[in-house]
Amino acid sequence: MEFADYIEMLKALGESTRLHIFEMLRNGTLCGCKILERLNITQPTLSHHMRVLCDCGLVKAEKDWKWTYYTIDCEKLQGLLSFLGDTKCMREKR
């Protein structure tokens, strides 16, 4: 992945509704209708947030007739976690 990909993923998760949606998807695939039931937002607002999460690559969408099911793209997430995990943290000794 490119540096810009990590930026887009982190920006997507930096918004509270999208982070809440991501947290809901941690337990597995969900229909957009179920996400909508749990959040106090409109359908167009949900569509916007899901588009952002899908466009950055963190979430995959699969259409099944009239419903769309969303799941976390584990490969993309692992890439982001690997990027963040390569960070060396230093603590001051007191």
PLM segments and residue spans:
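Helix-turn-helix DNA-binding motif, specifically the short coil turn and the N-cap/start of the second
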Residues: T42-T45
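Base-recognition residues in the alpha-helical recognition helix of bacterial helix-turn-helix
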Residues: E23, S47-H49, K66
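Alpha-helical residues within the helix-turn-helix
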Residues: E37, C54-D55
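Beta-hairpin "wing" of winged helix-turn-helix
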Residues: D55-D64, T71
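Short capping segments at the starts of secondary-structure elements
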Residues: S16-T17, N27-C31
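Amphipathic alpha-helical dimerization/coiled-coil segments
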Residues: M1-Y6, E23-N27, C74-R94
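Pre-recognition alpha-helix immediately N-terminal to the DNA-recognition helix
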Residues: L19-I21
